[in-house]
A protein has these predicted regions:
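Sec/Tat signal peptide C-region and signal peptidase I cleavage site
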Residues: 29-34
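Bacterial N-terminal signal peptides
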Residues: 16-28
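Structural signature of tandem-repeat unit edges
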Residues: 35-42, 60-68, 86-124, 133-146, ...
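N-terminal secretory signal peptides that target proteins for export/translocation
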Residues: 1-15
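Acidic Gly/Asp/Thr-rich repetitive segments characteristic of extracellular carbohydrate-active
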Residues: 38-59, 77
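N-terminal extracellular ligand-recognition/capping segment immediately after the signal peptide
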Residues: 66-77
């Protein structure tokens, strides 16, 4: 009498392959989903701690409120695809709402563009801030009165919301 096996090695291998594909697909779902984040920076220089290392390169849509200094701006550039030396990063930030932001001196340079660039004033979008970054949409601070040289240069921005007084 011939014995039938319910679990042939070929059948097990087939189902193991299917299971492996599903695990791979499900494991990558988190990377494909856009991540939105709202952050209030009460103390200038603390954006890196508020966002965290794990979320830094995953956030695609960020709303900021508070006062930012050079350290925060350096971190923000990295989130948007460029570091302070203007080298590419894995940052995926594409939408940035800075409506409730002002700037504070301090925290060091955030980008080297000929020379180290630093915050110039409370209501001035700093020079070369988003130069060469991957942003597509940006809402500028409500109280902004000046956009410094190159602040939005060489970007992929397709939509900018300007405050009335600029």
């Amino acid at each position: 009498m011939e014995r039938k096996e319910n679990c042939s090695s070929e059948g097990v291998l087939y189902y193991a392959r299917i299971l492996f594909v599903w695990v791979c697909l499900l494991g990558n779902v988190g990377h494909a989903v856009a991540k939105r984040l709202k952050v209030e920076v009460e103390t200038p220089g603390t954006l890196p701690e508020l966002v965290g290392k794990k979320a830094k390169y995953k956030v695609t849509d960020l709303t900021l409120k508070g006062t930012l200094n050079g350290r925060d701006l350096c971190f923000l550039r990295e989130m948007a695809g460029r570091d302070k030396e203007r080298q590419s990063t894995p940052g995926r930030l594409r939408t940035l709402d800075m409506r409730g932001v002002s700037f504070a001196r301090g925290g060091g340079g955030y980008v080297r563009h000929g020379e180290w660039r630093e915050v110039q004033g409370e209501h001035t979008l700093p020079p070369y801030l988003f130069s060469e970054c991957g942003l597509a949409h940006i809402v500028l601070p409500e109280r902004l009165d000046t956009i410094a040289e190159g602040a939005l240069g060489a970007t992929r921005i397709s939509r900018i919301v300007l405050p009335e007084n600029v």
